[in-house]
Amino acid sequence: MVASGDYLDVTTPQIEAGTGASSFIVTGTAPVTRASDMVTVPIKNNLYNLPFTVLCEVHKNWYKTPNVAPRVFDTGGHQTGAGIVMGFGSSGGYDGFPYCDIGGSDRRINENAGLEKMLIGMRVKSERSTCVVSNGKLSSETKTKWEYIRSTATIRIGGQTTAGLRHLFGHVRNFRLWHKELTDAQLGEVVE
């Protein structure tokens, strides 16, 4: 017999492929909804100034952008003009193209919009040339006005807010940040 206040713990395996993709989140006894899969990391001791390169593997679980601009990562708590964004956008016939935006330099790779899995990244050289990379394909470079980011800022991986704004709806793994500009050859990794 079940008495008032009794509860049953139920767990399910995590399934990352197929039509029933799921994740298991451990919660207490209070009923909850699925949390936004977002990680926040302090900038302090992780990033400050130029040059730098970011690379990570991304699997997006959609073929049409689910919101204005799903984020792989961006920054919060930074000074004016110091924001960094890497994610997916849509424009015209290209939906889900990889892009980066830092200090007024918006770079994109339209032809990789249809990829579900990819290695995505951005490189900012010491002389301020910026590009985005997706599965070994580099965008053209443009100069950024970005110089540094204050140490109280944060890196947000997988979305923009815990409320789900610009949520990725996908998986990010092997997130890497170098305090140097990688070569074109080093940016040539491909995820299939």
Predicted segments with their positions:
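Extended recognition patches within non-cytosolic domains
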Residues: 15-48, 65-66, 173-192
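Extracellular glycan-interaction patches encoded by glycine-rich segments
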Residues: 1-5, 150-177
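Short beta-strand segments enriched in hydrophobic/aromatic residues
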Residues: 58-60, 124-126, 161
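Short Gly/Ser/Thr-biased coil->beta-strand turn/linker motifs
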Residues: 43-44, 70-71, 96-100, 155
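A carbohydrate-recognition surface predominantly in extracellular/luminal proteins
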Residues: 45-61, 83-85, 116-120, 172-177
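Glycan-recognition/cleft segments
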Residues: 71-97
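Short surface loop/edge beta-strand patches of beta-sandwich-type extracellular domains
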Residues: 35-52, 77, 106-112
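Extracellular glycan-interaction surfaces
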Residues: 1, 8, 12, 87-146
